[in-house]
Design a protein with these regions (language model features):
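Structured catalytic-domain cores with a bias toward divalent-metal coordination
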Residues: 1-259
Length: 259
């Protein structure tokens, strides 16, 4: 399975594919995929992501899409990921595949991380295992803004947004925004290990099967792809969702000790 594909925002549907071997002894090779329906060549899963945020490659003719896309260049770098486990890709992957490039900075997208067995991101084994492509992207791109898209069944709403979540699960409860979309922080495991305190790390939960949830989440992503910093997002939340912003900040300070 090729997990290192990157799609250029400037390419068309019949894009050229490029294998990046920058920094290695092997020479760069390029295969023209225009007009081809398949290829038997695979890149090593240990290859690094390209340092050039405008170079790109995608896996064609397949869905779900395991490829990575990078739009734009420069700072800030925003990394959005979706379809982290189970069948959540059905509600989230399409949102990242349709998003447009940012006006400034870089936007890196992993539309689908894994569609296999459901393993919670709160499980310490998730990111070193199933989510290792996320870790590799974070290590190499060093994003200031990191966003995960998840989806939930209505029966699990209380588990995610209930007031006793911290006592029962060990992490703060999600805040309810609009149209069934919930907002919280990402797993403490990845937040503490890979991001400085000034980074913006968010987790959205969409209600499964809800077009309204998808539309609202898409609007939030359009805002976040242009956000420059944690402080800017806090100001936006204070203006648009004051009650949720207050709760989120209090929960974060209680859990992490600072914001």
């Amino acid at each position: 399975m090729n997990t290192d594909r990157i799609e250029n925002s400037k390419t068309t549907e019949n894009s050229e594919s490029m294998e990046n071997s920058k920094g290695k002894g092997n020479s760069e090779s390029m295969e023209n995929s225009k007009g081809k329906g398949n290829s038997n060549e695979e890149e090593s899963s240990d290859d690094s992501f390209s340092d050039d945020h405008e170079s790109a490659e995608t896996r064609s003719g397949s869905y779900p899409d395991f490829g990575m896309r990078i739009y734009g260049c420069g700072r800030p770098v925003r990394l959005f990921v979706a379809g982290l486990h189970g069948d959540e890709w059905k509600d989230t992957t399409g949102l990242l595949k349709r998003i447009k490039p940012p006006k400034t900075g870089t936007l890196a997208l992993i539309p689908l991380v894994d569609c296999g067995k459901y393993i919670s991101t709160l499980n310490p084994d998730y990111y070193p295992g199933v989510g290792k492509k996320i870790v590799r992207a974070i290590e190499e791109l060093k994003p200031e803004i990191y966003v995960e898209l998840h989806s939930y069944s209505s029966k699990n709403l209380e588990k995610l947004a209930g007031k006793n979540r911290l006592e029962l699960i060990g992490v703060p409860a999600y805040s309810v925004l609009k149209e069934g979309v919930l907002l919280g922080s990402v797993s403490p495991w990845i937040r503490r290990k890979y991001f400085p305190k000034e980074s913006l790390c968010l987790s959205f939960e969409l209600r499964k099967g809800s077009m309204e949830s998808r539309k609202f989440a898409a609007c939030m992503l359009e805002i976040l792809k242009e956000i420059q910093s944690l402080d800017e997002f806090i100001e936006y939340m204070k203006k648009e969702f004051p009650a949720q912003a207050k709760k989120a900040m209090e929960d974060y300070q209680r859990f992490y000790g600072e914001i």
